[in-house]
């Protein structure tokens, strides 16, 4: 569970870490020993037991106006963080904070039908800020208040659910509303408070943002450092007690320009580590900032591409985003249940959904890929279930889905993927989505095959997608089952031997079932996409790993284009 974002930039539904908010949940750290129960967890357990054994017990038998809960849980996120932000060589913000937030989940009825049924899932959770000190009485009173509020909401919604059940037609999927799971116990060592030399890092972040002064066409830039140490506490009426620490450091650089025709263009880059000591050296960071500035200068001069339908190569990172958007969201368990969901893959279990040389797993237990930290890692999910690797697709054949404790037809239990932002009910979500291939080629060979495929189709060029920022996946029945992915750096690869040409204004569009089966081959090296993903259970950190991919047909359309002119007044000092 992650608290609300801090020092956040605007983001789309699923946004690459390069432009995402900086406060994230990161991989859990294994404890060397089982420490004593923290005061906070002890207070949670005590008040939870008192509430669970008391609520609804004073009502007369059969009185729906007061019902005992069949399940009660407390999930508390405690985080300390430091955030530093600079732009154009000046410090814009420097802050430290300490927060504790509690999510109280109350379920009334029974696992087969409870207050969360159908469109009422949000009624399970009530959130409240907790005292920052280990004052047991203050903690227990605050949890008591949150529990009472949550119980009232749950009771109102349970009565609505029972009424609706009398008038609704038979549901396609009549699975229960909550799965039975084995209680979990793991008491990790709480994360220490963040300790950062703010003066040193304020200077370093400011110096990095100053690099963009050398690029007059960069109209906006932000460099942000966020260091967050978080501890998640979970206790339930089933007997689960889980404490897991999460440490994360992220440096984000973001820059924007505008072409003469009014099109806004941006580039971004992130650097991640467990602590600030793991970040690159300052000289390497400054070189990366200069590369961003140069790429924006080139992009604003690049031609706008026309709509295209032909062969393309996705770089490893671009392919990772592509799989996250096009496939990953549609394999989340709750997408297979509900009258409003498109259920693209619900009835495809046991069938080929990818070429036979591709397999896909989601493994939140993996913390790194090579030397890159995977931000979607965790030890226990936000329902207190142990994280586990899930083999979703094996040799092209769909095997299972990403499951929370919401059952679906033929899949009755969680597989450790119930995730949520504070204040939301956990749902099945991606962690570290990893794509592997048995049909690999060196990148140079993929390029040759791209040119051959373009010639075969009578195209003057193919496309190479080097970098992608974000995407949007539509999974509901009320809209077409389509996706849109926004590339940042795209090249035309000409069949006649001309140099590759940088272009702009491209969006990748299509439908998932068709797009996924057009993959012809993959590269022999994989790359990582780290990002934030938003859905009904909030914004959470995710990762995806994939090799470069050659696709026989990739459809693109023009991006929406602004009409605002570049700044009329030159930047200060330009006249000198």
Located regions from the model:
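N-terminal secretory signal peptides that target proteins for export/translocation
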Residues: 1-11
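Short clusters of small/polar residues that mark proteolytic maturation junctions
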Residues: 267-269, 403, 504-505
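Short solvent-exposed loop/turn micro-motifs enriched in small/polar/acidic residues
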Residues: 305, 382-385, 426, 456, ...
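Hydrophobic alpha-helical bundle architecture
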Residues: 436-514, 530, 534-536
